[in-house]
């Protein structure tokens, strides 16, 4: 038997947490969600609590109404094409994260992760790094495991290289930069 055509799946609404966009006037539609998003296991000593920042989707594109994740062709190589350059600094930390499905291409990995791969190797998802942000070719629709290595003092030098011309600061024509 089929359900009504006008019903939505129970998980169709947005939730607090990861999203690939934020639209003006739609923030109140989010609902609190206390489900587990990920589990992390460190090899050796875990970083201090103030170093446990997991970088998820970075909303770098603004069209005047909606902030969203900047679309970068998956095949593009960051440094070869003038993209972000990251300097590995600080203590290296190896870890494994089990991520629940997000339906997003962004992977919330420990900030400063410069090396990551699915566990076991040769399995989905295909992953790539753009600066300090990690993405998959397709949205993550099932639980995945990723092994990563992060440098706790890694720096993205994009702003130093491009100054105010960085895409993170671009606004559409006609938008007042003070609003």
Language-model-detected regions and their locations in the chain:
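Helix-boundary/low-complexity linker signature
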Residues: 1-179
């Amino acid at each position: 038997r089929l359900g009504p055509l006008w019903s939505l799946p129970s998980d169709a609404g947005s939730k607090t947490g990861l999203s690939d966009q934020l639209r003006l006037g739609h923030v109140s539609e989010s609902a609190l969600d206390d489900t587990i998003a990920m589990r992390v296991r460190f090899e050796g000593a875990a970083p201090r609590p103030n170093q446990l920042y997991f970088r998820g989707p970075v909303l770098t594109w603004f069209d005047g109404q909606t902030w969203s994740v900047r679309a970068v062709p998956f095949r593009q190589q960051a440094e070869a094409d003038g993209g972000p350059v990251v300097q590995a600094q600080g203590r290296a930390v190896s870890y494994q994260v089990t991520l629940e499905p997000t339906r997003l291409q962004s992977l919330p990995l420990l900030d400063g992760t410069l090396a990551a791969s699915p566990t076991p190797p040769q399995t989905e998802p295909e992953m790539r790094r753009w600066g300090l942000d990690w993405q998959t070719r397709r949205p993550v629709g099932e639980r995945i495991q990723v092994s990563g290595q992060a440098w706790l003092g890694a720096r993205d030098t994009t702003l130093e290289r491009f100054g105010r011309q960085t895409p993170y600061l671009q606004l559409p024509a006609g938008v007042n930069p003070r609003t």
